[in-house]
Each structure stands twice: as C-alpha cells, then as structure tokens.
Amino acid sequence: MRAIALYSTLFVLIAGALVIVAIHGGTNYAREFVDGYEHSIVRPSKEQQEHEPAAHTTGWTFSHRTQGRNYGLTEEQCNVAFPHLYREIDRAVQHRKDKWGNITPDELETAWRGDGIVRAQIHDNQLYIIDAHGVVDHNHRPRTVATLHSLHRAISAFQGKLPDIEFTFTVHDAALPDSNGNETTWAYTRREHQEKLWLMPDFGLWGWPDVGLRSFAELQEVLEHEEDEFVDKEPKLVWRGSVAVGSKDVRHGLVDHSKGKSWSDVQTLDWANSTNIQERLLSMQDHCSYMFVAQTEGNTYSGRLKYLLNCHSVLFSHDLEWLELYHHLMKKSGPDQNYIRVKRDFSDLASTMDRFSRPANYLQAQKIADNARRTFRERYLTPAAEACYWRAMIRGWSEVQDFQPEFWEEVTEYDKVKKKEVQKRKPRGAPFESYAIMEEVDWQLPAKARKMCIDE
C-alpha cells in the first residue's frame, strides 16, 4: 500500500516537473519544484536537528523502532532519549521546595476523596497497594487497574534501585472535588492554578479497551505499518464525540463552525443510542485515515488527545485549560510546529481549514504532521518514555518526601502452631501481584477473585 502510494506520488511529481519544463522553458524551475517537495517532507530544519537529543556518552542513541517499547532504560538513557519530558515533575518538586516544604504523612490520607483514590507505596522496587478507596465501579476500576499495571511495569523492568516512597493517586477526570482545593496527590490532569497536583501518565497509555483501544503500544504498531501516506488520506477534518460534557462550549463551537462545510466530517455521538453509535463511531485507526483531526476537551481533559497525536495527521486544537504531562511539547508555531491552534469557540476554524484543505497547501500541512509524528509517536509518547516518566516521578517525589515509609505493621494474630494470640509483623497492604488478581487489599480464605465484568 505504502509502496504504491510512494510511486504514485513520485510519478505525479515527475510529470509535474516535465510540464513546468515545457511551460517555463528550462530545467532549473522544475528541479526547484521537486527539491522543494523533498525538502519539505523529509529533511528536518537546522533548528530541528539541533533540538534532537544528544548521543549517550557511550554512543547510545534512541530509536523508536528498536527502543520504543524498552521499559527498562537506564536513568541516563532516559535523559538522553527524552530530555524535555520531565517539565511537570521539575515544576512540582520546585513548587514544594519554594512554597510548601516537604510532603508529610498527613497529606497521604484518602478521606478527603470519597472514591476513586488509591494509596500505595514502593518498597525495595516492589509496588504495594495500601488502600484502594472506591475503585470498583465501571468507571474507576479500569483506570485503576491500567494505572497500577503501567506503574508496576516501569518499576519491575528497571534494573537499578528506586527510592522507597508512599503516595496517593486519583483516577477522576478532576482530581480535586473542589477546583480550588489544596490537596496533594498524583493526577491525570490539572488546571494551571492547581500547583500541588503531580501529573502522572494517563491510564490510556496502557489501554482503553472499553472504547475499542485495546493497547496503546498496539495502536502505535498498527499505525507504523498500516497508516496511509499523508497525501492519500481523506482531506477532511474528523471529529466524533458527545456534546453532553463539561466543555460544552468548545464542542458546540466545533459542531457549529464545521456544519455544512465540504471539508468537514464532524458528527456528534449519543452514547445512549446504540444505532447512533454503530453508525457514527470511528476507531482511532479510522481517525488517522483523515488528513485533519480535531481535539476538544471533555468533562475536563480529553483522553483522546494522546491518541490523535499518534496520527500522521494535522491536529486542530483550541487552547487547553486542563494540562497533561506532555502538553508543553505541543508547538503552535515556528519550524517545530506540530499542531494548529484555533480559538476556543472555533470561530476561526472555517478560514483556517479553507486554507489548509487546498491541495496547494498540503505540503505545509504535511510538515506539521511530520513534526507531530516525530515528536510524539516516535519519541515522547512511546511506552519507553512513559516508563521513564514514572521512574523520574518516583525520584522527584522522594526528593521532597519528609518521612521514611513504614513497610511493616504490628498485628495480633492467632498462631495455630503455638495455639495462642501472638504479636506479628506483616507488610502493609497487598503486593501488586496479588492485588492484580484479587483487586482487594485484604481478603478471607478461601478466597474468590473479583469477576472481570460486573453488572451494576
């Protein structure tokens, strides 16, 4: 498929060059035409080359083809491969040092969040779940399971020693029940003023199977081998989503300003209507078959953004109020531009799309798509980068942790051998290996593991 598309493109270029020769009476103009195309889609600018990570001191360099799913990179390799990944961690650490001081055990209480919060610790490179608070419903459960698996993978793949820490994380769209709350926890997203929150990798970087995304790594693999060349994609802007969410303004704006346009494939979804879903829902691979993809925030952040950035397509996005750990890598202008910023109400969408949907501007559009693929799919959104981020977050948290986590707890148990009550020590919580099966911190024997699907 790719070979045919490539030869077709080359044929069109050569034919165009011959026509230009005939019209302009010379070869220089035609050569400039072909050279201009080659340079615009293949060779990064001098500034882009300068932004490439430096080589490892032993000569090691990162390649997404061979290292993209290497979950056990050393700390030095992580810094070489992903030098601009850790801004949110550095910010959170510095904020504690400048304003709040070190993290205390009192800040790890979970009662402030009614549900969807987990307390855990890492001891001797082992993940333990201390309290899984209200995470068994259809929304919180898959997020919790995915996040714990992702964190465990990053820990277990690493051959070095990680610091012992104790922490909490929430799996809500909005970590804080009060937008102006002051709690400290790990979260998927935050607003600019919520500076005590520490941003962790989103659960969707593991997988989101309940909406058809079986594995993030699998999506990247499929796109690497099956995605159409940019020039062969559907030259339209695609979006699917419900308007019954928190960010109604941006979604209604997108729908209103794309209605009836020849370049638009924007359609709303009604999740309560199975016929509507069957007719309109698109897979992420389907989204990547379009030249242009639209991003909107949802109840808070949008879980689809990281997937759309894997497409070799041009992303259109409004300014984002909810931050994720990689948002600072999105460039709206300059030689490294990797998406197109539109107004929050999408009022400038029509004029922008009228420009980029013209075939004469496909080369400029493709350069933006090239930059996005190079930055995200081939580097900063690889599974290897996610694992590196987790470990950097563990190190950063330990830097401002004001206590040594207690691994052991004293309990009174009946000793069947001594036939009396005795004082014993046991680890706090449950090791990940058992929690992954039981989804409980404690259980009675004979045990019964939680069912995979629960009707509510």
List each model region and its residues.
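Secretory-pathway glycan-assembly enzymes, especially type II membrane glycosyltransferases
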Residues: R2-N276, L281-S283, E409-V422, V441-E456
